């Protein structure tokens, strides 16, 4: 858990007076440990790690916390997607949220596309280029993905790129095609499923901790884009 913390600031700035003012301002900001613990607990719940959330809450002595229902089921669905068991994930998803795939076309398309990628992976990695193996991929794409693609240009482009995997030998794949077949696609779709389930349940779909991290990155990029030199600081906290 997060216990007593100290903040050491190291800076680089345009002038000594600016640096001193910045250090004075940062040291005047009080960060309560309970707020930090709340951010961590919120992150664990959003990520679906119920056991870790409960353990952390107990160690941090947080009593007034809320863990939404079906966290384990949500985590199980995400883990199935990450392992490539797309059919099982879809079945579990339909059991948990029966209407989600009817109302969320992006999630439906991405899950079906990932299933197609798993079929293509069998052809590519096992070097099974038989007519039967390729036909299985083509039939799946025709029956499940082709009806969705015309309604969305992004879907159409994605499907065309995916089908290109069957048109070239793996040794000649471009970086874009290699990325399509990368296992990181599973992680990406699992994250999409996690967010979609949370939205469907009326819950927050991004942890406050990640929001702060993303905001910090955005500020850094904006400063760089506008050629603004920002004073850097490195927090050092003692964790107990």
Curated annotation (Swiss-Prot):
The LisH domain covers: 32-64
Where the record annotates domain CTLH, the positions are: 70-127
| UniProt KW keywords | Cytoplasm, Nucleus
Note the InterPro entries from the entry. CRA_dom, CTLH/CRA, CTLH_C, LisH, Ubq-SigPath_Reg
One Pfam family of this chain: CTLH
**GO cellular component terms listed in the entry, alphabetical order:** cytoplasm; cytosol; GID complex; nucleus
Please provide the Gene Ontology terms (biological process) for this protein: negative regulation of gluconeogenesis; proteasome-mediated ubiquitin-dependent protein catabolic process
State its location(s).
Nucleus; Cytoplasm
Primary location: nucleus
Indicate the quaternary assembly: Identified in the GID/CTLH complex. In the absence of stress, the complex exists as an inactive anticipatory complex (GID(Ant)), composed of Gid1, the E3 ubiquitin-ligase Gid2, Gid5, Gid8, and the RING-like subunit Gid9, awaiting a substrate receptor to form the active E3 ligase complex. When cells are shifted to glucose-containing medium, the substrate receptor Gid4 is induced and becomes part of the complex, named GID(SR4). Additionally, Gid7 transforms the GID(SR4) E3 ligase core into a higher-order supramolecular assembly (Chelator-GID(SR4)).
Q: What does this protein do?
A: Component of the GID E3 ligase complex recruiting N termini and catalyzing ubiquitination of proteins targeted for degradation. GID E3 is regulated through assembly with interchangeable N-degron-binding substrate receptors induced by distinct environmental perturbations. Required for the adaptation to the presence of glucose in the growth medium; mediates in association with the substrate receptor VID24/GID4 the degradation of enzymes involved in gluconeogenesis when cells are shifted to glucose-containing medium.
The similarity comment for this entry is: Belongs to the GID8 family.
Name the UniProt record assigns to this protein: GID complex subunit 8
Source species of the chain: Schizosaccharomyces pombe (strain 972 / ATCC 24843)
